Amino acid sequence: MFYESVLAIEVSEVNVGDMASELESASAETVLREVVERFSPGVAVSCSFGGPSGLVIVDQLARMNLLDRVEVYYLDTGLLFSATHDVREEMERRYGFEATAYRPQLSLVQQASLHGNDLWDRDPDECCGIRKVAPNAEALGGKSAWITGIRRDQSVGREETPVLAWNARFRLVKVAPLRD
């Protein structure tokens, strides 16, 4: 109990804010280096292998010889294109790592049996909860930092994305090194 309290004090919204202020104008490489140095071995890198942001982060970590100090993971929803798997396999070969797949507890058939067909159309929040949110929570369990490819130019809701923020839901630091 005492150890958990000390850990909660060490990494909290308050001191993450201080670190975020220090790194707000830093390069992606500097942010990645600082985060890996401070939070490894509990650093997770989410990568969809379907867009450029995650690929850039994996490439940067590899060039900085930091890839072996993080867990690169992806959410295998059961609906990924074969081209996405091809990109992942090529990245794994090129950089010598193996990405961890996190999958929903329900197969697509089980989901349809329990919730009916086309859940994504009728209740997208429930569908994403099953296929993305729950597997992502599993991936982040016990981690201290989560590196994402989120960029401020991706949507109106992401315009104010900080370089570092405390994520209360997962109790870790969420990192956006490519924010600008």
Question: Can you say where each PLM-predicted feature lies in the sequence?
Answer:
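Nucleotide-activated chemistry modules centered on ATP-dependent adenylation/adenylyltransferase
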Residues: 2-180
